[in-house]
Amino acid sequence: MKSTLQELSLKEIIFQFRSGTLSSRDLVESAIQSHKEGLGAYRDFRRDAALEMASLADQAFRCGTDLGPLQGIPVSVKDLYGLSGTRTYAGSPKALPGAFEKEGPVISSLRCQHAVFMGKTHTVEFAFGGLGVNSHWGTPRNPWDANTHRVPGGSSCGAGVSLQEGSAWIALGSDTAGSVRVPACMTGCVGLKTSFGRWSLEGIFPLSPTLDTAGILTRTAEDALLGFCAIDPAYQGRQAELMKEVESLEPASICISTGDTNLWDGCEPGIAEIVEEALGELGRAGVRMVESTVSETEQAIELFRIGSVPGIELKEFLMSNLPSWIETADPVVGSRIKSSSSVDAGEYLRRLRVLKKLASDVQSHFETVDLIACPTLPISPPALAEVSAVEGYAPRNVASLRNTVVGNVLGLCGITLPVGLDASGMPVGLQLLGKHGSDAKLLSMACRIEKILGTSRQRLGIAPCFK
């Protein structure tokens, strides 16, 4: 069972901090008590450091200093981000050189706001995988199955678990093919992938400079909007403005395309049905639903299946900067790096040209619709035992990223909202993709949609591991 503090939304916490009815230290102590070692969310859970940061946030409040909406808020950090005072491993068995501890703009912004860093969450090695498997450190447990160890999604594999257990309200992640949205979906959370280039990647271990984006996982879409406004350079301090837009947004002003059948085909039992039911609810509430062909999605999926560019770029980076780390790579990661060896420079450049053209061509689709909707994942989180070996891992990894990678390849912003449970009792997500640069619009519409459909807690209930 969770404490009353754990039930508070980010908006409620922000208000209570400023009204003096709640302290950051009390909230952080609750977060520490909620942490469950057995779920394995963190590589480095920093109790003492978090309490010290909470005390600093409280002291600032007492002095009348308000540094931003995330002041005093518990935040978990994916172990790709440089964070002063703790080593960066990027999912590897040995720490990366000291240069990878340097903080980038995202972390620096949160530190300036006196956000509370709870620790480093686990990641798939080098962020190169969608299921969340890590043989070096152990794979975090998906809290939605109390009997079988199921994967939590990756590569930000500890992020969603940290939110569900209650040790954080914001989880920092990264998304190259779905690494924010996949774990958010598999653990019943909200996951925001920002538009490519919107947030600085400085201070974050690079998987693919061509496709990497920073993002956040939260418990609700409203929390995601507030987190976005705390981090995004163009929207810092504008959370009230966006919240007002949400309140005035009429359902009929939202137009959603259900996209091509390739985003719906092959879904495991209960997934497509749950998403269709959610879209039906939106339609009955007045949201305009249209069927339209988005041919670029099929081309994006095909490019991903033949390899796209992340594997090529990761191998080059490792060979140039961390050659000895290749030798100790997790088998499920090493096999993918190895498969990139056969791609020559000409093919790599061809793929870059295709990426650029697809991202350009798809923009015209958003002249008539606001969002593209589909299931976030076509599969249910598999049991860890089924994907521990390369043979079982490879096809499930491809399937887990099939729908999310479309957002990366086409240069879109995207979000996943939890909308129900599949036939196996595991979370199902509704993915919404928006035009490049329309992140604030996407979040506003996601919040309005959440008001119609309900939050994760309202639609999914409590994860079995916490009952």
Which residues make up each language-model segment?
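Short helix-loop capping/hinge segments that flank enzyme active sites or metal/cofactor-binding pockets
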Residues: L70-P93, P251-C255, S308-A359, P375, ...
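Short glycine/serine-rich loop/turn segments
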Residues: Q71-A214, G259-T261, C374-Y393
